[in-house]
A protein has these predicted regions:
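Walker A/P-loop NTP-binding active-site region of P-loop NTPases
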Residues: 73-132, 169
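Short, flexible loop motifs at catalytic/binding sites
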Residues: 50, 54-73, 86, 91, ...
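Short helix/loop capping segments that flank catalytic or ligand/cofactor-binding pockets
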Residues: 47, 57-59, 76, 105, ...
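Short His-Asn-centered micro-motif
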Residues: 69, 96-99, 289-291
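Basic- and hydrophobic-enriched, low-structure N-terminal and domain-boundary segments
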Residues: 1-68
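Aromatic/His-enriched, Gly/Pro-containing loop or helix-boundary segments
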Residues: 67-75, 134-139
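Conserved beta-strand position immediately N-terminal to the Walker
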Residues: 65, 94, 248
Length: 297
């Protein structure tokens, strides 16, 4: 007995049927890269993606990715799949800011260095550190450090820095850059901001005026140096990093449930990671910011 078609017959014009027959699957974006899975919206073809290739071929204007969705839809699984295949197959270098501590099994599988930070701990990273980025000149380094500190202090103070505070902060960083200190720290900045001098900002007249204008800054830095977040960013970097390895994970799970602390730690840790990303030469690099909302304050 011949099998019967379960669906009712349908009659249509060739103008419509040509889009459905012969059955075909879309080729996707037409670029190579990491195989991410099956594209269920385009006939079941495979879907591959590589932000570097997409940028090189003009599909995107910058190689950034945003993975968004409701809880439980697979955002983290998608990110981990992309990282695992990018590093394991394509030899990319990866730096991950991990607020939940959920990338540790992936780090073990790929041989990534794990840096675990927690208040009162012995492991420290210096957000002002240039890392291996020795190609950056002093002026550019001061600019990067200033941008990071403005974001960090703004988050602590819950306001934008006043123009005079911003100016004195930049002056303090320039003083440190010209002083010959190899690796200035947040403690060095706090020391200068506690007793600023008029030569740090030539447009001012007295040291006392400056000290009054920036009196909140040393106390704001104190949150990272000697109060609730001490032991994370209050000294030179003492982490052994294999610069020729596949990458690293910064485990921030110790402060994940403290929204204010997580924002500060993410800003500081991300600034440190960006110095690594800017180093010329070597493999193509990927920076992953899980829970990136924390950077928005």
């Amino acid at each position: 007995m011949r099998p019967q078609l379960a669906l009712a017959r349908h009659r249509a014009t060739t103008a419509h049927l040509c889009s459905a027959y012969p059955f075909a699957a879309e080729l996707g974006l037409g670029i190579g890269g990491v195989h991410m899975g099956t594209n269920l919206l385009t006939g079941g073809g495979g879907f591959a993606f590589d932000p570097f290739e997409a940028y090189a071929q003009g599909f995107v204007t910058n190689p950034n990715m945003l993975i968004a969705g409701e809880p439980g839809v697979g955002k983290s699984a998608t990110a981990k799949t992309f990282i695992h295949r990018s590093v394991g197959v394509f030899g990319r270098w990866v730096a991950i800011a991990d607020p939940k501590g959920e990338y540790l099994p992936l780090a073990e599988a790929l041989g990534l260095t794990v840096v675990k930070l927690h208040p009162g701990g012995a492991t420290r990273i210096n957000p002002l550190d240039a890392g291996p980025a020795t190609h950056v000149d002093a002026a550019e380094q001061v600019r990067r450090q200033s941008e990071m500190l403005v974001a960090l202090l703004g988050s602590v103070l819950k306001r934008d820095l006043a123009p005079v505070e911003d100016a004195v902060l930049g002056g303090a960083l320039r003083v440190l850059a010209s002083s010959g200190v190899a690796h200035p720290t947040l403690a060095d900045v706090a020391h200068l901001m506690a007793a600023p001098t008029a030569d740090m900002v030539p447009t001012t007249t007295t040291d006392a005026d400056l000290a009054k204008a920036v009196e909140s800054i040393p106390f704001a830095l104190g949150k990272l140096l000697d109060r609730s977040l001490r032991g994370m960013f209050d000294g030179p970097t003492n982490v052994g990093i294999d610069w020729h390895g596949p990458g690293l994970v910064i485990d921030l799970s110790a402060v994940h449930h403290d929204h204010e602390a997580l924002t500060l730690v993410m800003v500081a840790a991300t600034a440190w990671l960006q110095t690594l990303m800017a180093t010329p030469g070597g493999p193509r690099r990927i920076q992953v910011l899980d829970e990136a909302w924390a950077l928005l304050g």
